[in-house]
Regions:
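Electropositive polyanion-binding surfaces
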Residues: 1-178
Length: 178
């Protein structure tokens, strides 16, 4: 079992690296949890980051969603895609202005933008300005949406993508399963 999980983890890391090389944007955010006292008042803040196991599961869920979208594209039926358009240029310029004031660089050239965004995320990880920059970066992105017209998924760097892996909590996944 250990060998199998170790192998799966190596595969997941390879898939993740390939996604990043293809232009995927990786938000490794902290998850914030509050510990409560006996009166349900917060007495401690705990910051959690994704562990290797979380990333392993994430990569295979993304892969499953991608493969289902690729398979269904070959059919003639209408299909629900999860799409994510290019980021808003004006919002990216605003982000560039803010990060420059904080001492960082953001290259808005389309050929280097994704690498530059990921580099910025890496450089600010764990620093005081991380949450601000993460939030501004997310706001500069287009909103992902469900549609029958595929335009790809910018943030994941996928040509075709859908939601398939969580039919218990997302209705679009149920539609895809049908």
């Amino acid at each position: 079992l250990v060998d199998a999980i170790t192998t799966l983890n190596q595969i997941a890391k390879t898939i993740r690296k390939k996604r990043i090389n293809n232009g995927a944007i990786i938000f490794d955010k902290y998850e914030i949890k509050f510990k409560l006292d006996e009166k349900n008042k917060p007495n401690e803040v705990v910051f959690k980051t994704a562990k290797s196991a979380n990333k392993l599961i994430e990569e295979f869920m993304l892969l499953a969603n991608k493969r289902v979208a690729e398979k269904m594209k070959k059919g003639k039926e209408r299909f629900v895609y999860r799409v994510h358009d290019q980021p808003d240029e004006e919002k990216l310029k605003n982000l560039q202005t803010v990060v420059k004031r904080l001492g960082y660089n953001l290259d808005l050239n389309k050929n280097r933008l994704n690498d530059s965004l990921n580099t910025l995320l890496e450089k600010t990880f764990g620093k005081n300005e991380q949450n601000l920059i993460d939030t501004l970066m997310i706001r500069s992105m287009s909103k992902a949406e469900y549609t029958t017209k595929n335009i790809g998924h910018y943030g994941l760097a996928f040509d075709k993508y859908t939601h398939f892996t969580s039919p218990i909590r997302r209705y679009p996944d149920v539609l895809v399963h049908r």
